[in-house]
């Protein structure tokens, strides 16, 4: 299949990578796994055995008229331990390479169908100036966009860093969540070829 390239000849790409049916269940699973992997999982509370103190019986068993108590760190008490205390845990989910590649292909194919993937021959800025990048994006009528280049472009990254709803990455930094997070995805022809090789 052929992809239209702004200001250049059409680019021939693989049908298996850019012409797939959209697999919603697979994309959902991979995106959820990606988000789960980003969780810190460091929350922690103390059980009655971990709270400091509470070794001595607060008052004798019988004769006071009060309810019996054996420790001041009971979960019923204020300053006591937590009944089902939260503990640090790993939330990450396993995603097979084949599933990950399948989800990426599915997303890229859907972006093409929805006309949200724009391919240009080359995209760069002369200096790390946000104003220059804004002007370039205005020419292309883009404001909510992920810019993907073949290799790390320091100037482009610095120019995009302070812009709302604009992000610049190289091919290695692209993931399923970033592809669906923006209204449009702007890729250079070089980046398209690299993505195709990566997902082959």
Curated annotation (Swiss-Prot):
GO molecular function: rRNA binding; structural constituent of ribosome
Organism taxonomic ancestry: Bacteria, Pseudomonadati, Pseudomonadota, Gammaproteobacteria, Vibrionales
Gene3D superfamilies per record: 3.40.1370.10
UniProt family annotation: Belongs to the universal ribosomal protein uL4 family.
Organism: Vibrio atlanticus (strain LGP32) (Vibrio splendidus (strain Mel32))
Subunit structure: Part of the 50S ribosomal subunit.
Protein name: Large ribosomal subunit protein uL4
Superkingdom of the source species: Bacteria
Region (Disordered), start-end ranges: 42-65
């Amino acid at each position: 299949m052929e992809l239209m390239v702004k200001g250049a000849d059409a680019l021939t790409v693989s049908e298996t990578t850019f012409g797939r049916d959209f697999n919603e269940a697979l994309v959902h699973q991979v995106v959820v796994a990606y988000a789960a992997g980003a969780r810190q999982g460091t929350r922690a509370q103390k059980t009655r055995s971990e709270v400091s103190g509470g070794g001595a019986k607060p008052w004798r068993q019988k004769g006071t008229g009060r309810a019996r108590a054996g420790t001041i760190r009971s979960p019923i008490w204020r300053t006591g331990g937590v009944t089902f205390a939260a503990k640090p845990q790993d939330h990450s989910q396993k995603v097979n390479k084949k599933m990950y590649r399948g989800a990426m292909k599915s997303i890229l194919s859907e972006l093409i169908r929805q006309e949200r993937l724009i391919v240009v021959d080359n995209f760069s800025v002369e200096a790390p100036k946000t104003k220059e990048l804004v002007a370039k994006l205005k020419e292309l009528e883009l404001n909510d966009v992920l810019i993907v280049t073949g290799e790390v472009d320091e100037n482009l990254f610095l120019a995009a860093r302070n812009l709302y709803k604009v992000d610049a990455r190289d091919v290695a930094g692209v993931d399923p969540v970033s592809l669906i997070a923006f209204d449009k995805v702007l890729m250079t022809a070089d980046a398209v070829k690299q993505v195709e090789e990566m997902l082959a």
